[in-house]
Amino acid sequence: MKGVGIPEILSYGRTKHYNILVEPFLGKSLFHLYQENNKHFDMKDICLMGIQIIDRLEWIHSKNVIHRDIKPDNFLIGQSNPNIIYLIDFGLSTKYRSSVSGRHIKFGFTGKLTGTTKYSSANSIRGAEQSRKDDLESVAYMIIFFMKGYLPWQDVDSKDEINKLFKIYMMKKNIPEKNLCSGLPQEICAFLKYIKNLHFEEQPDYNYLRSLFKW
């Protein structure tokens, strides 16, 4: 893949024990920058990030690929140009639509979580197939985390991992958008609500989503 904010593959190959992929050296992750900045980003910076993040997802989605592990650690700034945000780590990525037939995958259950619990969509938590809307739901949680400094399910604890995931799933599924986004600009609530109302195979309106960060 090659696009703005998608690392170029410089070389690849394999040895007896390893697969090798060489990419350009990039800068710090958004999570690292957030930590360095006393766990705070200006609203203007968050809006600029949001627009670029949507750009990256629209591009990979146009190539019939979903990322499935959207989180602050997987967005890095450029080394030579820190104004460009790069999306990295496609280890969990998969095709959601055939490049030949154009047929979208069907909704179903894989039986396992794919992604990072804190930012994964509710459907992913319950082991369902993911589509474009799930990548974008993760973006919403990431933006809310940057604005609030926490997500309500990150402190859920249980000795039983299945029970823990069930509790997190129920929170993500049932918490009203207005509660999760309380104290935040109404555009963030609109962003999350729009994504949650998308059908599994529906193409997101990326222009509309970008417009929610232009204020």
Task: Show where each model-derived region lies.
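Structural motif at the C-terminus of the N-lobe alphaC helix and the adjacent alphaC-beta4 loop
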Residues: 1-4
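Protein kinase subdomain VIII
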Residues: 101-102, 113-128
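Short beta-strand micro-motifs within the conserved protein kinase catalytic domain, predominantly
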Residues: 8-19
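Structural motif in protein kinase domains
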Residues: 26-36
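Conserved C-lobe activation region of Hanks-type protein kinase-like domains
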Residues: 124-181
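Activation segment signature within eukaryotic-like protein kinase domains
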Residues: 49-50
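Catalytic-loop of the protein kinase fold
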Residues: 61-79
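Activation segment/activation loop of eukaryotic-type protein kinase catalytic domains
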Residues: 78-114
